[in-house]
A protein has these predicted regions:
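An acidic, Gly/Ser/Thr/Pro-rich helix-cap/linker signature
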Residues: 4-5, 13-106
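Solvent-exposed, acidic/flexible segments
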Residues: 80, 84-95, 104-107, 126-134, ...
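Short, functionally critical alpha-helical segments immediately adjacent to catalytic or ligand/cofactor-binding
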Residues: 107-122, 182-188, 275-278
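Substrate-binding/active-site groove segments that recognize
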Residues: 129-150, 162-164, 169, 193-196
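Catalytic and binding regions of secreted/periplasmic enzymes and modules that target cell-wall glycans
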Residues: 169-196
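Primarily a LysM-type cell-wall glycan-binding module
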Residues: 239-269, 293
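LysM (lysin motif) carbohydrate-binding repeats in extracellular/periplasmic proteins that recognize
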Residues: 260-289
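Extracellular LysM carbohydrate-binding repeats and other cell-envelope/extracellular binding modules
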Residues: 278-308
Length: 308
């Protein structure tokens, strides 16, 4: 691969500079670079599992359209090499935080992979304005009890946003009777699922015709589960030392105003960067807590940053 890389890098300037002349490389000559001795470049389809499930519900792989949908997501995700490696590293640090809340709320641990599909375990913002680890729109976030203002955005709070997502999913499950359709509604909204049930007379995610994004959505979570449960089967060889370790954190409860978060950090033998890393819900350099609300701030232990 290295030899091919440097050969192409050398040839590309010639192609660009001589584009209007007679000495340009033909398509056949360019593609023949891959056939030289010692050069190997293979892209193969990822393996499709014989069985799959999500949240305890079997994926009907006996249907060709279901197999093809899952294979599409497996193929897409496994070829995001760097992104997927980083997600698997982050999972070592944050999976426990998410699964603890899922267990407390009575939800299947597979919903961790829905969080992966939503945000790649990062404090993301979508073009549509959905934010945080679970990608809530502001209106839905407030409906499920999350605080959003110029100083606090609990969509970026691991625990609170996960609990809000659990509330939504349990409400949707009570309405639809399957976790996969509840998960689909998390992407498109219950009103849109209701419309499709009305005119399709279908209450099964795998049988329902849906917009492309939602049609792919649950399959994406299933694909993440499949790959991350057995990464070596998909060509990803991470050593134990490659995975990010959970950071030892202490809980500090704040029911007062904070004039400057950096001063707060210094009092706890850390800095604002470390405070923000584990409390992305902090959206300002201060907190006007005039109603004395009780916030939980995660503070790294004194020697946590130096851990090996």
């Amino acid at each position: 691969m290295r030899r091919l890389f440097f050969t192409i890098c050398f040839c590309l300037p010639l192609i660009v500079c001589c584009g209007n002349g007679t000495d340009t490389l033909s398509s056949a000559q360019i593609f023949s670079l891959e056939e030289r001795e010692g050069v190997e470049q293979r892209i193969v389809m990822p393996p499709l599992p014989q069985k799959a499930s999500f949240a305890g519900e079997e994926v009907p792989l006996q249907y060709f359209d279901v197999r093809e949908s899952l294979l599409r997501e497996l193929t897409t995700i496994t070829h995001w090499h760097g992104s997927l490696m980083y997600i698997m590293q982050l999972a070592g640090r944050y999976r426990g935080m998410v699964e603890k809340v899922l267990e407390e709320e009575g939800l299947h641990p597979d919903f961790f992979y829905l969080c992966v599909a939503e945000s790649s375990l990062q404090p993301a913002t979508s073009p549509a304005g959905a934010k945080g680890y679970w990608q809530f729109l502001a209106s839905t976030a407030k409906e499920f009890g999350l605080e959003i203002n110029s100083q606090v955005d609990e969509r970026f709070n691991w625990e609170k946003s996960t609990r809000a997502a659990c509330k939504y999913l349990k409400k949707a499950y009570e309405k639809y009777g399957t976790w996969t359709l509840a998960a689909a509604s998390y992407n498109i909204g219950m009103a849109n699922i209701d419309d499709r049930i009305g005119y399709q007379n279908i209450r099964n995610y795998y049988d329902m015709q849906l917009p492309l994004e939602t049609a792919r959505y649950v399959f994406r979570a299933i694909a993440f589960k499949t790959i991350m449960s057995n990464p070596r089967a998909y060509g990803f060889y991470l050593k134990k030392s490659d995975i990010f370790k959970p950071i030892e954190l202490k809980e500090v409860f704040v029911d007062y105003s904070i004039a400057n978060w950096s001063d707060f950090a210094a009092k706890h033998n850390t800095n604002f960067k470390m405070i923000k890393m584990f409390n992305e819900w902090i959206r300002s350099n201060h907190l006007d807590n005039k109603y004395k609300k009780r916030y939980k701030v995660l503070v790294p232990a004194e020697d946590a940053r130096s851990m090996q």
